[in-house]
């Protein structure tokens, strides 16, 4: 296929046009008074969003050179979203500003490679300064404030996230689901819950709720099917002597074994309940090991030389309470040693860090949370489906932002942290004048998020930026109320991780784009395909079909 090639200024201009189209669509959403963007969908109602990365992902331009520029800046937003879960609009505004300033310098004859080296040097200094500015987000108040800011100043969402983190711990799993009412609600599942219920409804001992509830039961964990009752009779007799109920978690319980357990249960003999083990394949084995660690038991597995016929009470786990429903099982307060549980959680955390699959990461994090103390579910309420989608996106953003805040602490929000980090660049010098120009490019770009927040709130950006620069520390501008003051006291916080990743990703992609000299893309089909269509000679234009 024939290619279209553009060089030098022409290539950079078209790339910059694409960057501006995407960045101008995204930047209107920044800050407490940022506007919404309406996105048409090929099916269903249009989406209304104030989420930078959602807007960026929808933009595809007709001109292929412009589109390349737009896609490269979209990469900035996506990468920031992946790392920090928020700050996508800030990253886009930074990238656009670095490119605009940088393109002027390249046009003036400066060396693009030296400009990039200067920008990279400035980023390293600014990131160090951001770390120095950050304070730990230890208390619920700071977490709620970060969540509120990220959810577009929705304090209810911030409070719900703070409550959820308080209940399940900062490493616990918090999921966001669509609710069935107009209100946002929080549900917390204490203990370990997995999505398998009783094998037979005859195991239920609470007829009103159709659940099986046991206090201080023994828990038998088996990684194979149980179909022959004779395999487990010796163990059942030992459990009977202790007058305790028994929960069996196995790959399956069937035929004679299931029938005998059900009959025993109904006659009021041994109180039992059989549940299929959660997961499939290797994940099932791992989850059985998790339950064993939590309850202080051992998985009866032929792979390690254990059999049901010789199983003893010491190999069974125990828990304070177990509730088994039609579709779920909840184990509360397992008897496992806290040190063993911590080691298991740490082992899973290492697997999360090493995993490259998002799906595997999600499943590993769920396992980690179930061991660490439970799962919280935030149910988002709204009047219409369109509002529900928009709100769910905001809650997801807020959740990611609070996690980032817990990880690396918080800095003053509203673009102030980047303005303060500029102080680290005042004495910084490169190896030559072009590198110094690169440092100045980043210095000017670091004002851009604050300028955009002020512009979106309808004020004069230059006046506000000069006022903020004349102050120090947490002194900044609250765009929601139009007041100056201490940003931390006003509850305007950003996670340090968000500010850092936005700056690093914007400078990384923008620096590479500055050093572009040639752009190559496929020619549109019509440009090289039409010539062949006339070669038919009397075949009515069918020559191109041969």
From Swiss-Prot:
GO BP terms, alphabetized: protein refolding
Residues reported to bind ATP: 29-32, 50, 86-90, 414, 478-480, 494
Compartment(s) where it occurs, according to its Swiss-Prot or TrEMBL record: Cytoplasm
Transmembrane segments: none
Reactions performed catalytically: ATP + H2O + a folded polypeptide = ADP + phosphate + an unfolded polypeptide
Family assignment from sequence similarity: Belongs to the chaperonin (HSP60) family.
Descriptive protein name: Chaperonin GroEL
Lineage of the organism: Bacteria, Pseudomonadati, Pseudomonadota, Gammaproteobacteria, Moraxellales
Gene field: groEL
